[in-house]
Each structure stands twice: as structure tokens, then as C-alpha cells.
From Swiss-Prot:
Entry EC no(s): 2.3.1.234, 2.7.11.1
Subunit structure of this chain's protein: Component of the KEOPS complex that consists of Kae1, Bud32, Cgi121 and Pcc1; the whole complex dimerizes.
Protein name: Probable bifunctional tRNA threonylcarbamoyladenosine biosynthesis protein
Subcellular location: Cytoplasm
Pfam family, one: TsaD
Organism: Methanocorpusculum labreanum (strain ATCC 43576 / DSM 4855 / Z)
CDD domains reported for this sequence: ASKHA_NBD_Kae1_arch_bac (cd24131)
GO MF term (any one): protein serine/threonine/tyrosine kinase activity
Main subcellular location of this protein, as a coarse class: cytoplasm
Co-factor binding comment: Binds 1 Fe(2+) ion per subunit.
Stored InterPro entries: ATPase_NBD, Bud32, Gcp-like_dom, KAE1/TsaD, Kae1_archaea_euk, Kinase-like_dom_sf, Peptidase_M22_CS, RIO_dom
Lineage: Archaea, Methanobacteriati, Methanobacteriota, Stenosarchaea group, Methanomicrobia
Binding locations of Fe cation: 106, 110, 127, 283
Role description: Required for the formation of a threonylcarbamoyl group on adenosine at position 37 (t(6)A37) in tRNAs that read codons beginning with adenine. Is a component of the KEOPS complex that is probably involved in the transfer of the threonylcarbamoyl moiety of threonylcarbamoyl-AMP (TC-AMP) to the N6 group of A37. The Kae1 domain likely plays a direct catalytic role in this reaction. The Bud32 domain probably displays kinase activity that regulates Kae1 function.
Length: 525
């Protein structure tokens, strides 16, 4: 039986693109919108799409030649005016040809074209584009978001910095070129568990040029800092899930330095890394056509009447009907066997744990040394303060600038054995931690151990001594994301955690409300 042939239409933001996919890519035609000055204006981008749509579609259909079996289009997320042009074009064409219509999630399409090209079965995916920066993995029918930007997408941060210095759009490739002649200067490095924030980094980069630092040095340091943040959270997802494949997708992923850094991280961990070629990295019709094809084969078409665009369509809202595997993940009840986490190696003796923070080959040495020393000191201070506050934590035996010797805890790591009892226990412990004026910073189930009928916390490298509500909310957000991405009953576990948290901490309700606000920030921006 011949392969189905699907026409895909991409039009979420800056590029109007159409492609036909069968067994392989048949053809791809694009007409990108380039603003004369500044960034992308949604109305002007939509006007551009409307003016080029007929020509782009005609070229794709003429080159494809044979009959089209379905029309797929990017239904969201994206800029509303641009999405509506693509959707109207797709509906009209589907009706004219008498073929099914398929609404494709733009972010998931980036993931699927990456899986198709690399042949990786179940990877962790770093998706870095203008408006989106996410770390994703598949579990039980959905792409789960392990971490994402809490303010601005990486590509938009690069573009805004470039525009502030009168560089043309898009700014990323120009920054990449200028960075090749630069040297490292310190800029803010903001990782919150597996989440990221780029606005402070962007502002600091602007200030650095204003005080006389060269553009080459600032571009180099902006890239090195932002990319190291992305690679770190990707490694955290690898370490937490036990997966062994990484794919880089999205327009920013075309950057050679980001690819080099991810490849180095994976080499050090014994994981595999690949990125699709440049033609599949930025927004393109091929990814919509391919994802539309596998959705068609799974029966996931959409009636015309229900094909309303969704500018805020999240990756984790998509029912992935075309994948029949559950997604590889650590099995419940499995014992901890790994002696290397995302940041450190762990050596066990009869009574002690020796935690050694490892140099990262993907980070520039100056940044790497700074983070290792800073996080080792922060961890030792936080554990000692938490213990004084009555929080269940291991006893510190000795500390150097890169190593901590602490009490060995015999018990189960919660990521393998999480249940309602343990979730409530985690809530009690975190409530005590916040009451003591400490936030953890990396509150995942990898960093919780059930020991002596209580939940103990470990790995305080991202901790803060603070009573501010924002970092407390981030703690809860990181944990809730972890539960959503790695458990089958996250709502039940979150409810149990909240019960324990409220019992231990009088300000719990305010923090829970802040966590919800933080959750709403992690959207298409």
C-alpha cells in the first residue's frame, strides 16, 4: 500500500512554510517574514503570511505532483493572527481537496521531526526556540515538561539583546558569530531546579556593554551562560529519568556551540546526542507534514468546526495517540544504583557518603569553578541550618571547596517508591524547611529519601537562606512538575503533599497560590 502523502502548513510566527511528506520529505517551500526594523509584529507577520500563502502552497503541490491524502496545519501555540491565516488556508484546501484536516501542536512537531531524523526512540528533548525553552520527555501518552523558562524564551532573549544594540533580526546568528572572538565575563546564572530564567541574564548583558565591556565578550558570555543553563537542566532530566538519548530541536538549536555543549555533556554521561539538520530546526512545514502524517495514521484528524487555533496550546496538553510505548522511566520499587547524579559523583562507605562535584567539560572553566565552589558552600550551609531548624537532613562530617562528606542514609529514594504516605511526609519536611527560612532550589523526588519513617532532604546545591515567597513557590513548582512528568497519579500525590505542607507551615496557603502563579508563567510567550 503506498505511503500516505500529507501537506503540512506552518504559520505560527515568522515563517509561512508548506511541505509534503510521504515515506520521506517530498518537498519544502518557505517564505519567511523579515521585519524591516525591530522584532516580529503579529499583525504585520499575518499580513505577510496572507500575501505569500497561495504562492507557497502552489509550489509545494506542483512539486509533489501526486494526490494529497490530508492537510495538516499548526494549530498552536503561536501568534494568534499568524495562526489564523495558516488555519484558514488549511481548512480551505482540505475542503477543496476533500481530504481530512489535522491540527498539529507546533512544539510537539519539533519533537517528532527530531525523533524521525535521529531514529531515537525515547529521548529527553531540549526544545529551544524564540518563544519556547523546554525540556521534555514522554510518559504514558503525553510529552511531559520537566523544566522550562519561567519568563522569556531563549531565542527572544537573544533577539531582544541584539535589538538593543541595533543588530538586525534575527539576532541569534549574529550573536553566535560575534561570540567566536570573545572571552568570558561573569553574568547571572539562573537555574531553579529544572526551570530557567533568562530576563536577568539579558538585562545584565545590556548593562555589561553600557559599562564598556566589548560586544564580543558580552556575546560570548551571554551564549556560554544561557547555553550552560540549558545543558544543565537537560542533564538533570537525564539523571532523574534514567533515559540515555538527547535531541536538540528548535531554531536556537541550530547554534553550533549549543550542539557542541550538549554533545560534550552526553559524552561525559555515556548518553547519545543528535540534532536534526538546520532545515528541520527552525519553524518549517516539514515538521507539520510529518507529524500530521503519523497523526493521520493514528486516526487523529479534526472536524473543520473544531479546528479553532489555540495560541497557548501546551506540549503537555497533547494526547499522543500515535505512540504506543509508555516511555522508558525508572520502575517503581527499583533501587538506586547510579552513583552519579547531574552534578556530582557519590561514593558510599559503611557510614558515610562522599559527594564530589564534578567539573563539566561543556562549561567554560571560569564559570564551572565558580558554580562548583558556590554550590558546595551553599549546600553545606543550608544542611547545617536545616538541621538546626529541625528538618530531617544528613549530618555533615567534612567540607572542602568541591566535596562534602555526610552521614549515609539507609532508605528508599522517593522517585522509585513515591506514594501518598511518602508524599505527605515530603510535605511535612518541606514545610519545616520553609519555616526555618530555607528553600531547597531543586526539590525533586531524586533528592528525597524515606529514612526512619520520615522524608529526609538531600542535595542543597541550589538552596537559599530566604523567607521570600517566590523561591518557596518555585520549590513547590519544581516538585509538582516532577510529579506530573514522572508519576501516574500526580494529582493524588500533590494533594497528599499539600496536606503535609499545610500541617507544618502556617504560610502554606500563600505559597501554594504563588506556585499557581508561577505555573501560569510557563506558557508560550
Amino acid at each position: 500500500m503506498p505511503e500516505k502523502r500529507v501537506l503540512g502548513i506552518e504559520g505560527t510566527a515568522w515563517n509561512f512554510s508548506a511541505a509534503v511528506f510521504a515515506e520521506d520529505l517530498v518537498c519544502l517551500h518557505s517564505a519567511p517574514y523579515v521585519p524591516p526594523t525591530g522584532g516580529i509584529h503579529p499583525r504585520e507577520a499575518a499580513q505577510h503570511h496572507a500575501s505569500v500563502a497561495s504562492d507557497v502552497i502552489r509550489k509545494a503541490l506542483d512539486e509533489a505532483g501526486e494526490k494529497i491524502d490530508a492537510v495538516a496545519f499548526s494549530i498552536g501555540p503561536g501568534l494568534g493572527p499568524s495562526l489564523r491565516i495558516a488555519a484558514t488556508t488549511a481548512r480551505t484546501l482540505a475542503l477543496k481537496l476533500g481530504v481530512p484536516l489535522i491540527g498539529v501542536n507546533h512544539c510537539v512537531a519539533h519533537v517528532e521531526i527530531g525523533r524521525w531524523y535521529t531514529k531515537f526512540a525515547d529521548p529527553i528533548v531540549l526544545y529551544a526556540s524564540g518563544a519556547n525553552t523546554q525540556v521534555l520527555g514522554f510518559l504514558n501518552g503525553k510529552y511531559r515538561i520537566f523544566g522550562e523558562t519561567l519568563d522569556i524564551g531563549l531565542g527572544n532573549a537573544l533577539d531582544k539583546f541584539a535589538r538593543s544594540h541595533n543588530l538586525p533580526h534575527p539576532g541569534g546568528p549574529i550573536i553566535e558569530k560575534m561570540a567566536k572572538d570573545g572571552s568570558y565575563i561573569h553574568l547571572p546564572y539562573t537555574v531553579k531546579g529544572m526551570d530557567l530564567a533568562f530576563s536577568g541574564l539579558m538585562s545584565a548583558a545590556k548593562e555589561a556593554t553600557q559599562r564598556g565591556e566589548s560586544m564580543e565578550d558580552v556575546c560570548f558570555s551571554f551564549q556560554e551562560t544561557a547555553f550552560a543553563m540549558c545543558v544543565e537542566v537537560t542533564e538533570r532530566a537525564l539523571a532523574h529519568t534514567g533515559k540515555d538519548e538527547v535531541i536538540l530541536v528548535g531554531g536556537v538549536g541550530a547554534n553550533a556551540r549549543l550542539q557542541e555543549m550538549l554533545a560534550k555533556m552526553c559524552e561525559e554521561r555515556g548518553a547519545k546526542f543528535m540534532a536534526p539538520p538546520r532545515v528541520y530546526m527552525g519553524d518549517n512545514g516539514a515538521m507539520i507534514a510529518y507529524t500530521g502524517k503519523i497523526m493521520l495514521e493514528a486516526g487523529s484528524t479534526i472536524p473543520i468546526a473544531e479546528s479553532v487555533v489555540n495560541p497557548g496550546f501546551r506540549s503537555d496538553q497533547v494526547e499522543v495517540t500515535w505512540r504506543h510505548d509508555a516511555g522508558q522511566l525508572f520502575a517503581p520499587g527499583q533501587s538506586e544504583t547510579a552513583e552519579r547524579g547531574a552534578e556530582a559523583s557519590v561514593n558510599l562507605t559503611d557510614k558515610d557518603v562522599v559527594k564530589t562535584r564534578l567539573a563539566k567539560g561543556y562549561r567554560v572553566p571560569e564559570l564551572d569553578r565558580h558554580l562548583i565552589a558556590e554550590r558546595t558552600r551553599a549546600e553545606a550551609r543550608a544542611i547545617s541550618a536545616a538541621r538546626r531548624g529541625g528538618v530531617p537532613v544528613p549530618v555533615i562530617r567534612d567540607v572542602t571547596d568541591h566535596e562534602i562528606v555526610m552521614e549515609k542514609l539507609d532508605g528508599d529514594v522517593l522517585k522509585y517508591v513515591m506514594n501518598e504516605e511518602y508524599a505527605k511526609g515530603a510535605g511535612l519536611t518541606v514545610g519545616k524547611l520553609h519555616k526555618a527560612g530555607i528553600t531547597h532550589g531543586d526539590l525533586t523526588t531524586s533528592n528525597m529519601i524515606w529514612h526512619n519513617d520520615r522524608v529526609y532532604l538531600i542535595d542543597f546545591g541550589l538552596s537559599q537562606m530566604t523567607e521570600e515567597i517566590e523561591p518557596r513557590g518555585v520549590d513547590l513548582h519544581v516538585l509538582f512538575q516532577t510529579l506530573e512528568s514522572t508519576t501516574e497519579n500526580p494529582e493524588t500525590l500533590k494533594s497528599a503533599f499539600i496536606n503535609g505542607y499545610c500541617a507544618a507551615f502556617s504560610e502554606a496557603e500563600n505559597v501554594i497560590r504563588r506556585e499557581h502563579e508561577i505555573e501560569l508563567r510557563g506558557r508560550y510567550l
